[in-house]
Design a protein with these regions (language model features):
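Class I SAM-dependent methyltransferase SAM/SAH-binding core
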Residues: 51-53, 57-105
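A short SAM/SAH-binding and catalytic strip from SAM-dependent methyltransferases
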Residues: 115-130
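A short acidic, Gly/Pro-enriched loop at the edge of an enzyme's catalytic core
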Residues: 107-117
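Core SAM-dependent methyltransferase catalytic element
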Residues: 204-206, 227-250
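A short glycine-rich, Lys/Arg-flanked "PGG" loop and its adjoining helix->strand segment in the class I
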Residues: 130-145
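Conserved class I S-adenosyl-L-methionine
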Residues: 1-46, 59, 63, 146-176
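Short alpha-helix
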Residues: 188-211
Length: 250
């Protein structure tokens, strides 16, 4: 596990946390992709214990509470995100159990406990995917549901240039780390093949129930100009910007 990457990412997220308050939260899964209202991937949450990996400002946990979850748990590497989530959930009338920890070090969570574990655009920040997925497998009940969304693996391999999408970015065949600036703050993530995600889940005892690689119908139906922006509608018309996985613990 690369502790230097964790330290840098934590520092940057503590700086950025307030600027991301309330963004990319359930029922949304990400940018220009179908929502939970459309996909209906979650089971009934009434009376369930849920865990949010990378809980951010707590808006997805509030959505779970609004839909009947009985226990709201969350972890995040950013101390500031945890502070924001605690404040937001308390003001919203919900008790929560939030832990300031990297997802690679969530071993203190109860075992075989959660009915649903989910991560909305956060799981890809892990610097050790096998360890993180095994941590999740240890905390979720048999038959429990894991749902997560993240950038589609092709996103780092494609660049937009001169009205074309070109396969000239990262090498898809290698799970390399990528350094960049997010809102002016240095961060580092690992680019992973789709097979890396699927095989890691299988090796940890998960069964894939559904893999979503879609663009929102509203985006597909609307005319748009070509753009070089990372999350551009013109790109979303040609390829999925994100993917969503629903898996169950065997």
């Amino acid at each position: 596990m690369d502790n230097k990457v964790l330290t840098q990412n934590k520092k940057s997220w503590d700086i950025m946390a307030d600027n991301w308050f309330g963004t990319t939260a359930l029922p949304a899964y990400g940018c220009l992709i179908p929502t939970e209202d459309e996909l209906k991937l979650f089971p009934s949450l009434i009376g369930t214990k849920v865990l949010d990996i990378g809980c951010g400002s707590g808006h997805s946990l509030k959505w779970c509470g609004d839909n009947g979850a009985s226990e709201l748990w969350g972890i995040d590497i950013s101390t500031r995100q945890i502070e924001n989530a605690e404040s937001y959930l308390t003001k919203s009338g919900y008790e929560s159990k939030l832990i300031d920890t990297p997802m690679e070090e969530m071993g203190q969570l109860p075992k075989n406990y959660f009915d649903v574990i989910y991560s909305i655009y956060a799981l890809g920040w892990t610097v050790d995917l096998p360890k993180t997925i095994h941590n999740i497998a240890a905390s979720i009940k048999q038959g429990g549901i894991l749902i997560f969304s993240w950038d589609h693996p092709l996103m780092h391999c494609v660049i937009a240039q001169e009205n074309k999408l070109l396969l000239e970015g990262c090498n898809y065949l290698t799970d390399d780390f990528v350094s960049f600036e997010l809102r002016g703050n240095p961060v580092k993530i690992q680019s992973r093949k789709m097979s890396t995600w699927i095989n890691t889940l299988a090796e940890a005892g998960f069964k894939i129930e559904k893999l979503v690689e879609e663009t929102s119908e509203k985006v597909l139906e609307k005319e748009c100009e070509f753009s070089t922006n990372y999350y551009a509608p013109s790109r979303a018309k040609k390829m999925p910007l994100s993917f969503i996985v629903k898996a169950s613990k065997l």
